[in-house]
């Protein structure tokens, strides 16, 4: 891939160099004077046929790419006024790119360490991950990795398995599940988890708490998938549009938002777990106090997500202002906890649940701030 920065070069000899290759560009290009700087190849803009602008390609680059006269190259205009030039055959499609890696863990590594290594390869964008086991590996290691891959990796399948090797293939196309859709799904699950977690806390519902914990695993799967998407998009900017983003800078926004949603789901899970630790039904007055803090928290999260979806800076600022009241309400309930004469175990559980509500409001603020950043970007001038 070659990033082409359009500038005017004082290179009259270019037009006389028969070895150069010419590509027709039916678009307007800004140019400026300059000389060859570092790895930047400068070429003079020319016109052929009275209508098409042309610019010659560096001969070395053409040879490196194995191109010849008549081959097709793809030219993609970027928001930073540059062009990205890619040989047509090398354009990623979001399908299996054939990228393959082999993991050969040493004997002393435990299964969690091996899983972290495999996960790192998944996040790096490899489509086929081969895990070769040492002779001393126990059979349960294969089972552990197989189940973990199915649980954690979106669209993955175990395509081959033996006592010596396990092969995981990632079949999902980035275009099938673009980043905005992933965020939308994570948002929906996180909101439901928070509502159910609060209901579980107020009503001491162990079955509901277990369901919330199960949903957290789904949020984690989507989080890992979007990190994989964003990593590949940063490495290969031709994927930006394919994963549903309009600007390379959106990768940072979606990285922050996805992490915030993953942490919100984690804290909703904490609230659900704390509800299982409460020994007796909470006093109605305490339930009312908790409801005040939780209602504001839910509202802050929902407003932040709406602001992100609509690039609404006004709503985002409203959400940030409301988030400050969550801390006040939560601290107010904590200060009163001793008056309800709960058991020590129940007191600790309620306090930790209130702390999680505070953390959720803070992560919701992060989402709102990203919405404001997107709003500014939509209105900026080039």
Report each predicted region and the residues it spans.
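Compositionally biased low-complexity segments, especially N-terminal hydrophobic helices
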Residues: 3-4, 23, 254, 272
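Cytosolic, long alpha-helical scaffolding segments
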Residues: 40-45, 50-52, 56-382
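Acidic, Ala/Val/Gly-enriched low-complexity intrinsically disordered segments
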Residues: 9-12, 19, 23-24, 31
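Intrinsically disordered, low-complexity polyampholyte segments enriched for Lys and acidic residues
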Residues: 3, 7-10, 26, 36
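Extreme N-terminal segment that seeds HTH/winged-HTH DNA-binding domains in transcriptional regulators
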Residues: 26-47
